[in-house]
Amino acid sequence: MMNLRVLFLALLLLASPLLQVARCQSDAEDHSSLVDDVVGENTDDAVEEDDHDLDMNLSSFPGVETVCVFPKNSAKLVPAGEETELLVGLKNEGKTRVGVMGIRASVHLPYDHKLLVQNLTMLRLNNASIPTSLQATFPYIFAVSQYLQPGAFDLVGYIIYDVEGKPYQSVFYNGTIEVVESGGLLSGESVFLLTLGIGLLLLLGLWAYSQVQRLTKKTKKVSKVEVGTRSTEASLDEWLEGTTLAKTSSGKTKNKKN
Protein backbone atom coordinates (compact mmCIF):
# COMPACT_ATOMS: atom_id res chain seq x y z
CA MET A 1 0.00 0.00 0.00
CA MET A 2 2.87 2.33 0.84
CA ASN A 3 4.48 1.63 -2.54
CA LEU A 4 1.24 2.52 -4.34
CA ARG A 5 1.08 5.85 -2.53
CA VAL A 6 4.67 6.64 -3.44
CA LEU A 7 4.05 5.75 -7.09
CA PHE A 8 0.91 7.92 -7.15
CA LEU A 9 2.79 10.92 -5.74
CA ALA A 10 5.59 10.40 -8.24
CA LEU A 11 3.11 10.35 -11.13
CA LEU A 12 1.57 13.60 -9.87
CA LEU A 13 5.02 15.22 -9.79
CA LEU A 14 5.70 14.05 -13.35
CA ALA A 15 2.33 15.30 -14.61
CA SER A 16 2.65 18.78 -13.10
CA PRO A 17 5.11 20.10 -15.79
CA LEU A 18 2.70 18.96 -18.51
CA LEU A 19 -0.16 20.87 -16.91
CA GLN A 20 2.00 24.00 -16.58
CA VAL A 21 3.16 23.78 -20.22
CA ALA A 22 -0.42 23.33 -21.46
CA ARG A 23 -1.60 26.27 -19.37
CA CYS A 24 1.23 28.52 -20.57
CA GLN A 25 0.52 27.62 -24.19
CA SER A 26 -3.18 28.38 -23.85
CA ASP A 27 -2.42 31.70 -22.13
CA ALA A 28 0.09 32.57 -24.84
CA GLU A 29 -2.43 31.78 -27.59
CA ASP A 30 -5.11 33.90 -25.93
CA HIS A 31 -2.69 36.80 -25.43
CA SER A 32 -1.42 36.53 -28.99
CA SER A 33 -4.93 36.56 -30.47
CA LEU A 34 -5.84 39.57 -28.30
CA VAL A 35 -2.75 41.48 -29.41
CA ASP A 36 -3.44 40.64 -33.05
CA ASP A 37 -7.02 41.90 -32.76
CA VAL A 38 -6.01 45.17 -31.10
CA VAL A 39 -3.11 45.85 -33.46
CA GLY A 40 -5.22 44.94 -36.46
CA GLU A 41 -8.00 47.34 -35.49
CA ASN A 42 -5.66 50.26 -34.85
CA THR A 43 -3.06 49.94 -37.60
CA ASP A 44 -4.50 48.09 -40.57
CA ASP A 45 -5.85 51.18 -42.30
CA ALA A 46 -2.73 53.31 -41.83
CA VAL A 47 -0.26 50.58 -42.79
CA GLU A 48 -2.28 49.56 -45.82
CA GLU A 49 -2.11 53.07 -47.27
CA ASP A 50 1.51 53.77 -46.29
CA ASP A 51 3.07 50.47 -47.40
CA HIS A 52 0.88 49.58 -50.34
CA ASP A 53 3.70 50.33 -52.75
CA LEU A 54 6.13 48.10 -50.80
CA ASP A 55 3.85 45.07 -50.59
CA MET A 56 3.26 44.25 -54.24
CA ASN A 57 4.44 41.29 -56.29
CA LEU A 58 7.22 42.94 -58.25
CA SER A 59 9.86 41.61 -60.58
CA SER A 60 13.60 42.15 -60.29
CA PHE A 61 15.60 44.52 -62.45
CA PRO A 62 18.53 43.19 -64.55
CA GLY A 63 21.91 44.26 -63.25
CA VAL A 64 20.87 44.51 -59.59
CA GLU A 65 22.56 41.95 -57.33
CA THR A 66 21.83 41.31 -53.66
CA VAL A 67 23.61 39.54 -50.82
CA CYS A 68 22.74 38.86 -47.17
CA VAL A 69 24.95 38.27 -44.13
CA PHE A 70 24.11 37.41 -40.51
CA PRO A 71 26.93 39.20 -38.66
CA LYS A 72 28.43 37.13 -35.82
CA ASN A 73 25.65 34.59 -36.29
CA SER A 74 26.72 32.05 -38.90
CA ALA A 75 24.36 29.44 -37.42
CA LYS A 76 21.41 31.77 -38.13
CA LEU A 77 19.95 31.36 -34.64
CA VAL A 78 17.02 33.68 -33.98
CA PRO A 79 15.92 34.01 -30.32
CA ALA A 80 12.14 34.31 -30.07
CA GLY A 81 11.05 37.78 -28.97
CA GLU A 82 14.53 39.30 -29.33
CA GLU A 83 15.96 41.49 -32.07
CA THR A 84 18.15 39.88 -34.71
CA GLU A 85 20.29 41.85 -37.15
CA LEU A 86 21.26 40.99 -40.70
CA LEU A 87 23.04 43.02 -43.37
CA VAL A 88 21.55 43.41 -46.84
CA GLY A 89 23.91 44.36 -49.64
CA LEU A 90 22.78 45.70 -53.03
CA LYS A 91 25.12 46.18 -56.00
CA ASN A 92 24.09 48.27 -58.98
CA GLU A 93 25.58 46.80 -62.18
CA GLY A 94 23.10 48.61 -64.42
CA LYS A 95 23.36 51.82 -66.37
CA THR A 96 20.97 53.92 -64.30
CA ARG A 97 20.68 55.03 -60.71
CA VAL A 98 18.83 52.78 -58.26
CA GLY A 99 16.76 54.26 -55.45
CA VAL A 100 16.21 51.86 -52.56
CA MET A 101 12.69 52.19 -51.14
CA GLY A 102 12.62 49.62 -48.35
CA ILE A 103 13.15 46.12 -47.01
CA ARG A 104 10.51 43.60 -45.95
CA ALA A 105 10.60 39.99 -44.82
CA SER A 106 8.33 37.20 -43.66
CA VAL A 107 8.56 33.84 -41.90
CA HIS A 108 7.04 30.70 -43.44
CA LEU A 109 6.80 27.01 -42.71
CA PRO A 110 9.75 25.24 -44.38
CA TYR A 111 7.70 22.69 -46.30
CA ASP A 112 5.17 25.16 -47.75
CA HIS A 113 5.79 28.89 -48.25
CA LYS A 114 2.07 29.42 -48.79
CA LEU A 115 1.63 28.93 -45.04
CA LEU A 116 2.63 32.29 -43.61
CA VAL A 117 3.80 32.31 -40.00
CA GLN A 118 4.58 35.99 -39.47
CA ASN A 119 5.12 39.21 -41.41
CA LEU A 120 8.20 40.99 -40.08
CA THR A 121 9.03 44.67 -39.75
CA MET A 122 8.85 46.84 -42.86
CA LEU A 123 11.94 49.06 -43.13
CA ARG A 124 11.51 52.20 -45.26
CA LEU A 125 14.70 53.70 -46.75
CA ASN A 126 13.20 56.70 -48.59
CA ASN A 127 14.84 56.09 -51.97
CA ALA A 128 18.44 55.85 -50.84
CA SER A 129 20.36 56.44 -54.07
CA ILE A 130 22.95 53.98 -55.41
CA PRO A 131 24.86 55.16 -58.50
CA THR A 132 25.96 52.78 -61.21
CA SER A 133 28.83 50.35 -60.52
CA LEU A 134 28.55 50.94 -56.77
CA GLN A 135 27.11 48.97 -53.89
CA ALA A 136 25.54 49.76 -50.52
CA THR A 137 24.80 47.84 -47.35
CA PHE A 138 21.70 48.29 -45.21
CA PRO A 139 21.18 46.84 -41.71
CA TYR A 140 17.83 45.15 -41.18
CA ILE A 141 16.67 44.37 -37.64
CA PHE A 142 13.72 42.08 -37.03
CA ALA A 143 12.18 40.04 -34.22
CA VAL A 144 10.00 36.96 -34.46
CA SER A 145 7.12 36.52 -32.03
CA GLN A 146 8.06 35.49 -28.50
CA TYR A 147 5.29 32.88 -28.66
CA LEU A 148 6.73 31.19 -31.74
CA GLN A 149 7.62 27.59 -31.01
CA PRO A 150 11.35 26.79 -31.35
CA GLY A 151 12.28 25.02 -34.56
CA ALA A 152 13.31 25.49 -38.17
CA PHE A 153 11.49 28.08 -40.29
CA ASP A 154 12.10 29.71 -43.65
CA LEU A 155 12.90 33.42 -43.84
CA VAL A 156 12.12 35.21 -47.11
CA GLY A 157 13.44 38.75 -47.48
CA TYR A 158 12.91 41.32 -50.24
CA ILE A 159 14.58 44.63 -51.00
CA ILE A 160 12.37 47.05 -52.94
CA TYR A 161 13.94 49.67 -55.18
CA ASP A 162 13.09 52.17 -57.86
CA VAL A 163 14.60 52.39 -61.34
CA GLU A 164 13.51 55.29 -63.54
CA GLY A 165 10.31 55.74 -61.57
CA LYS A 166 9.24 52.10 -61.70
CA PRO A 167 9.33 49.86 -58.57
CA TYR A 168 11.17 46.53 -58.54
CA GLN A 169 12.16 44.02 -55.88
CA SER A 170 14.82 41.36 -55.46
CA VAL A 171 15.07 38.49 -53.00
CA PHE A 172 18.09 38.93 -50.73
CA TYR A 173 17.49 35.85 -48.58
CA ASN A 174 15.39 32.72 -48.97
CA GLY A 175 16.58 30.09 -46.54
CA THR A 176 16.23 28.42 -43.17
CA ILE A 177 16.61 30.04 -39.77
CA GLU A 178 16.56 28.31 -36.39
CA VAL A 179 14.21 29.87 -33.87
CA VAL A 180 15.36 29.22 -30.29
CA GLU A 181 14.03 30.14 -26.87
CA SER A 182 15.54 33.23 -25.32
CA GLY A 183 16.85 33.73 -21.81
CA GLY A 184 18.51 30.41 -21.11
CA LEU A 185 20.55 27.48 -22.35
CA LEU A 186 17.81 24.94 -21.60
CA SER A 187 14.45 25.07 -23.34
CA GLY A 188 11.16 24.09 -21.73
CA GLU A 189 11.18 20.77 -23.56
CA SER A 190 14.68 19.98 -22.32
CA VAL A 191 13.71 20.74 -18.72
CA PHE A 192 10.62 18.56 -19.03
CA LEU A 193 12.58 15.64 -20.50
CA LEU A 194 15.19 15.97 -17.76
CA THR A 195 12.48 15.97 -15.08
CA LEU A 196 10.81 12.97 -16.69
CA GLY A 197 14.08 11.05 -16.79
CA ILE A 198 14.81 11.74 -13.12
CA GLY A 199 11.28 10.66 -12.19
CA LEU A 200 11.61 7.40 -14.10
CA LEU A 201 14.93 6.69 -12.39
CA LEU A 202 13.31 7.28 -9.00
CA LEU A 203 10.45 4.93 -9.84
CA LEU A 204 12.91 2.28 -10.99
CA GLY A 205 14.88 2.67 -7.76
CA LEU A 206 11.73 2.33 -5.63
CA TRP A 207 10.70 -0.79 -7.52
CA ALA A 208 14.15 -2.38 -7.11
CA TYR A 209 14.15 -1.51 -3.40
CA SER A 210 10.72 -3.12 -2.89
CA GLN A 211 11.88 -6.28 -4.66
CA VAL A 212 14.97 -6.54 -2.45
CA GLN A 213 12.86 -6.02 0.67
CA ARG A 214 10.44 -8.75 -0.41
CA LEU A 215 13.23 -11.26 -1.05
CA THR A 216 14.80 -10.44 2.32
CA LYS A 217 11.53 -11.09 4.16
CA LYS A 218 11.05 -14.45 2.41
CA THR A 219 14.55 -15.55 3.41
CA LYS A 220 13.93 -14.66 7.05
CA LYS A 221 10.64 -16.58 7.12
CA VAL A 222 12.22 -19.75 5.72
CA SER A 223 15.07 -19.69 8.25
CA LYS A 224 12.62 -19.31 11.16
CA VAL A 225 10.67 -22.41 10.09
CA GLU A 226 13.83 -24.53 10.04
CA VAL A 227 14.85 -23.42 13.52
CA GLY A 228 11.36 -24.09 14.85
CA THR A 229 11.37 -27.66 13.50
CA ARG A 230 14.67 -28.46 15.15
CA SER A 231 13.56 -27.11 18.49
CA THR A 232 10.30 -29.06 18.26
CA GLU A 233 12.15 -32.32 17.57
CA ALA A 234 14.47 -31.68 20.50
CA SER A 235 11.55 -31.00 22.85
CA LEU A 236 9.79 -34.20 21.71
CA ASP A 237 12.91 -36.23 22.52
CA GLU A 238 13.04 -34.73 25.99
CA TRP A 239 9.31 -35.39 26.53
CA LEU A 240 9.64 -39.05 25.47
CA GLU A 241 12.43 -39.69 27.98
CA GLY A 242 11.17 -41.71 30.94
CA THR A 243 7.98 -42.89 29.22
CA THR A 244 7.05 -46.48 28.40
CA LEU A 245 7.77 -45.90 24.75
CA ALA A 246 11.26 -44.73 25.57
CA LYS A 247 11.90 -47.76 27.84
CA THR A 248 10.62 -50.15 25.20
CA SER A 249 12.82 -48.54 22.60
CA SER A 250 15.87 -48.80 24.87
CA GLY A 251 15.08 -52.47 25.64
CA LYS A 252 14.89 -53.32 21.98
CA THR A 253 18.21 -51.64 21.45
CA LYS A 254 19.86 -53.74 24.20
CA ASN A 255 18.43 -56.99 22.82
CA LYS A 256 19.79 -56.21 19.39
CA LYS A 257 23.23 -55.61 20.88
CA ASN A 258 23.13 -58.98 22.73
From Swiss-Prot:
Membrane topology of the entry: Single-pass type I membrane protein
Function: TRAP proteins are part of a complex whose function is to bind calcium to the ER membrane and thereby regulate the retention of ER resident proteins. May be involved in the recycling of the translocation apparatus after completion of the translocation process or may function as a membrane-bound chaperone facilitating folding of translocated proteins.
Subunit details: Heterotetramer of TRAP-alpha, TRAP-beta, TRAP-delta and TRAP-gamma.
Database matches in Pfam families: TRAP_alpha (PF03896)
Matching InterPro entries: TRAP_alpha
A GO cellular component entry from the record: vacuole
Domain notes: Shows a remarkable charge distribution with the N-terminus being highly negatively charged, and the cytoplasmic C-terminus positively charged.
Regions crossing the membrane: 191-209
Highest taxon above the source species: Eukaryota
Alphabetical UniProt keywords: Calcium, Endoplasmic reticulum, Glycoprotein, Membrane, Phosphoprotein, Signal, Transmembrane, Transmembrane helix
Family that this chain belongs to: Belongs to the TRAP-alpha family.
Positions of glycan attachment: 57, 119, 127
Locations listed in the record: Endoplasmic reticulum membrane
Organism expressing this protein natively: Arabidopsis thaliana (Mouse-ear cress)
Record-given protein name: Translocon-associated protein subunit alpha
